[in-house]
Amino acid sequence: MNEKALELQQKVQEKVEVLKKQGGFKILEGIIDGKKGIRDMNPKSEARRSAFLTDEDKAEKRRQLKSELEVLKELVEAGSLTEATDKAKSKSAEIAKLLKDNLKNIFKNTQDLEKAYRSVDLFFRNADEQSIRNLYFLNIPLEEFVSADNSNLREELTKHFDQNYDRFSLEDNYSLLVIPGFLGESLDYWSKQASKYRVTLVTDYTDELEFESIEDNIEERKIAGDARYLANTLVTCNYAVARQRYEGIEDDDLYLPMSIPLAGKMYSGNGIQPSAGKKHGKIDGVLGTRLPLLRTHVDKIDKMGMVPIIYEKEWGTVAMSDTTLANESTDPDQRAIGVVRAKDWIAKVLLDYFNSLTFQNFDGRLREEIKQQLNKFFDKIKGHGKLIESFSIDELKKDPDNPQAVLVSINVKPYFATKHYVIDYSGTQGSFAHEEK
């Protein structure tokens, strides 16, 4: 061993003797977090120390401990207590800034992923189910649905829907298509697809910071109308707070569109009963809404053909309409989503049933059997708390112009959810008397 090495060894030994007088290795154990490996370096346990220095699974702990010791070394070398304190404060501020910057980047880079997972969580919460059958996720960004140039996506989805709807048995057909976010110019296309396959499209309007922006945008390009295919589309308006911001790291709370949780509500609800209002439209798992909508705002949004999402302290976050995009239709059945969904479901049941009867001779026996089955089916879904108020089988006979066709005419009267209560009240002689004392 050369002279320089001996001198270094002597200095190290002197420092060790000083440490022993001050409390030994316990000083380091008291300064450095034990989770970072300092206890593993205690010289009293040579085997533990050796394992810590050589095991591959301890590499991260060794890196953390080295970093801590380097900081401690800098403080010891600072000289006076004042210099050491100033250096510690400077180092702490530097590390705090680095941590803050890293957290900002983490939240920014993982925001889309967080939104996706939180949205799925909201669906399950509002569906009130731990396990859901026949639920499919498409890992496709909104931009792909918005783009009219993405013919491949449109072709593949059309093919997929055909595979499940263009069949004699409709047991695997879809009932909901949920596309969170605003579809822009492509909203019309996806509405037509939903109508074609008797599916309810649930989507959203843009995330606006003030109500006036919604009015201006709708005035410039309205999305509602009277076309039949618009009756299968539900558009929510007003984003909700999924999580409050982390102070000093994020500039704003985390907001999510409400199409997914509303679809969860619709999945678990009664077909004719819309997921709207205080009792049936409460969205679970959110903290409030972007816009504090008033009743006048709600009425205007409803007339725009959208479902306003409101927040009331006693109610929570609530969907406050059952209107479809076909809110300008003269047919009230097309304006209420509960009625649209109920009639679509009934139509699918009838298609499935009559498909199973094809190529049977239509004689008196079969005619009577069909009538019995139809009466039995409609009786099950008729009455309070069910889908329809009444029904009538108006026609069930052979087509006089086509011997291989049978004409079936059924009329149903669905239940409608109450949107307004018109109150007319008066007191004695048409006015309320008020006597001041």
Enumerate the language-model features and the residues they cover.
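Acidic, glycine-rich, low-complexity linker/loop segments at the periphery of domains that act as short
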Residues: 2-25, 301-310, 386-437
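Generic structural hydrophobic/aromatic packing signal, biased to beta-strands
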Residues: 177-179, 201-202, 346, 391-393, ...
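Short, hydrophobic/π-rich interface segment
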Residues: 366-388
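Residue-level marker of positions within ordered structural domains that often coincide
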Residues: 182, 379, 415
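Small-residue-rich
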Residues: 1-221
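Short secondary-structure junctions and interdomain/linker hinges
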Residues: 76-83, 308, 353, 357, ...
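Long, internal scaffold/assembly segments composed of regular secondary structure
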Residues: 214-259
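Long, contiguous, structured domain-core segments that constitute the functional module of a protein
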Residues: 240-373, 409, 413-437
